[in-house]
Amino acid sequence: MPRPKIARQICGRPANSCFKPNGRPMHQLEQVALAADEFEALRLVDLEGMQQQEAAVVMGVSRQTLANILKKARYKVVDCLSQGKALMMQASDPDTSGDIPL
């Protein structure tokens, strides 16, 4: 049985629920889901310029957990950009909390 997820602090939200290549209908695209905690980790580290340790404290997780979240998120973003897939932003799940609901 996997270990239960620690509640994560999610304070930012994406401007859109989906990013996809121009000129292709959504039904023709493979979709990749980006979880709320993955978006938040990318936002804090890559956009806000926080160190991983600082971002981990903000999200309420360990630095290693944040690094694992970032690795998954970056893989998904690069996969979508290089393969022409749609990147779908998921709403926050019950294991997250924050100031702004997704």
Swiss-Prot record:
State the source organism's domain of life.
Bacteria
Entry-linked Gene3D superfamilies? Winged helix-like DNA-binding domain superfamily/Winged helix DNA-binding domain
Pfam families attached to this UniProt entry = DUF134
Annotated coiled-coil segments of the chain: none
Q: Where is the signal peptide?
A: none
Q: Where are the transmembrane segments?
A: none
SUPFAM superfamilies recorded for this chain? Sigma3 and sigma4 domains of RNA polymerase sigma factors
The record's similarity note reads: Belongs to the UPF0251 family.
The record's PANTHER family line, in alphabetical order, gives:
PTHR37478, UPF0251 PROTEIN TK0562
**UniProt protein name:** UPF0251 protein ASA_1331
